[in-house]
Amino acid sequence: MEEVVVPRHGDHHNINIKYGFFIFALTIIQTIFFLQVKFIQIKRWNSTGRFSKFWSQITNPPIWLMVTVWLLIVIFTGGHKISDFSEEYIISAKRYGRMAYCLIPLNIYLVLRPTNSPLLKPGYYLENMSLHKWTSRIIVFCSTIHAAGYVYKWIKEGAILNKPFRFLNLLGVVVFVFLVVLAIISIRPFRRKVYSTFYLIHNVTAWSMVILITFHARPGVTVFAVISLILLGYQLYLRYYSSYMVNSLKVIDIPTSTLQIIKIPQSNKFPNWLPGSHIRLNYTISKFKSWTTASHPFTVVTIPEDSTNNLTLIVRKPNSFVINPLDSYLVTGPYPSLAPPFFTTANIVNIICGGSGISLGLPIYHHFKSINSTVPVKLVWTIRNQNDTFIMNQLDMTGVQVYVTSIGDTNSEQQENQQQAVPLFVIEEEEEEQGHGLLNNDNENGIELQNMPKTNEESSEANSTNSKNNKDNQERKEYFKFGRPKFDEVFAIDDPTTTYDLDNSWVIACGPDELISDAKRWSKDRGYRFYYEKYEM
């Protein structure tokens, strides 16, 4: 027989409903606020012709500040009007459970990816990823307090072997177990090693929490459940039904390189995109993998002005995303990285990229060279494997400064052994022994830009042209240097007498943490604006 809660707790049964609506109202206010300030930031940037650091900081406040504010809110709300915690702890425990559920719509919203939305905050969904991770942790925090309160209560009552297994209670136990497993596997080292498992557990947990807690929660949470389901449905729509189907993908590489060039036929309906934008590639809806694995983001190297029929990508060699030229795939996007006013207001642009990070720098470089040639723009690309320079034969890299940082035999295995010993960058006149060893984990840093293996047919083609590529490799040596670039040298202003508006002077970095850190420090020392992307999961 089910426990009758109302007579036992009186009006305490419904006392927490208002706190759930309070938390949900705050999430709505936050969402509207950031939508508005992002829109204002871009409009003001367009109208004034100057980047505003103030509006940028309002649009993207420090993550520690956002997390601290939310933690203070949930802690204060969880203990509000609790006069005797030893007697009323269960009221607080229930409240934390309700607050956790009322944060779910915000957490889903933060990972929505509307395409081609350069004026909207969600259009730059990568900006929301850190907040999504920390909101998830706050949900786990609230859920843990909720669970701990009930475990304590059941132990006191001597019902710990009974009540957790009542059907409605068991639904909550199941969801909490999922949350604990997700919290553990989402720790960065685990997540990187078993990302596909993490992704599957993440989705199962999200759907389970939305659906099962609808029945578990007493009083009900129907309003929040409906909103969450609508958002999840919209997420599926964006992933599958607003996508473009493509086939006949082409892979270009050489066996000794760590990079590949991927060419994707461009759909006639695919919209124009800003330089540096990325797409996401997924299996078709009929494939089981499309439901159990994440879609894969890739930065588009080509720009609309190239007038090609392909979307060209530069990616690292494959590990999990297998491309079959006979299969069809879904492409979603484009998703902008830099806001539109950047391309019309920048008056000096310095770009530093490591490894596959060239995929961000090259289209921005090409844009200014071909569309806005009055803007001084420089691009530095650092690689460890000399054979990666084969892409210089496939793409226009005129004027790009290329540095090979692994010195010695070009054999990829030997270069791999040398990687840990070669520091890559010198900022001003730092001691060599203080080098930061950048790019030591190039494939581990940045948004999850997974790479794709070549097919047997493409492998055969690559082998047949390997000798030609080796010859080309020797010819390319005159276009790149060995060693470490110095920022002050590679980004030296051509005309020292020229002064630039620092609000519109930029440094852009794409690569691993150390590269980004050094570029940011150099940029800050000179008062430049700074933008970066790091490729990781």
Curated annotation (Swiss-Prot):
Any one annotated GO CC term: plasma membrane
Gene3D superfamilies: Nucleotide-binding domain of ferredoxin-NADP reductase (FNR) module (3.40.50.80)
Record keyword Electron transport present: yes
Transmembrane segments: 20-40, 58-78, 95-112, 133-155, 167-187, 194-216, 221-238
UniProt cross-references to InterPro entries, sorted A to Z: FAD-bd_8, Fe3_Rdtase_TM_dom, Fe_red_NAD-bd_6, FNR_nucleotide-bd, RBOH/FRE
UniProt GO molecular function: ferric-chelate reductase activity
UniProt-annotated stretches for the region Disordered: 432-475
CDD domains recorded: NOX_Duox_like_FAD_NADP
Protein localization: Membrane
Enzyme Commission no: 1.16.1.-
Keyword terms: Electron transport, FAD, Flavoprotein, Ion transport, Membrane, NADP, Oxidoreductase, Transmembrane, Transmembrane helix, Transport
Domain of life: Eukaryota
UniProt KW Electron transport keyword: yes
Bilayer topology: Multi-pass membrane protein
UniProt domain FAD-binding FR-type: residue ranges: 187-363
Predominant place of localization: membrane
Residues of the signal peptide: none
Pfam (any one): Ferric_reduct
Limits of the Ferric oxidoreductase domain: 97-213
GO BP annotations listed: reductive iron assimilation
Function, in words: Probable cell surface metalloreductase. May be involved in iron or copper homeostasis.
Similarity comment text for this entry: Belongs to the ferric reductase (FRE) family. AIM14 subfamily.
Protein's name in the database: Probable metalloreductase AIM14
Record organism: Candida dubliniensis (strain CD36 / ATCC MYA-646 / CBS 7987 / NCPF 3949 / NRRL Y-17841)
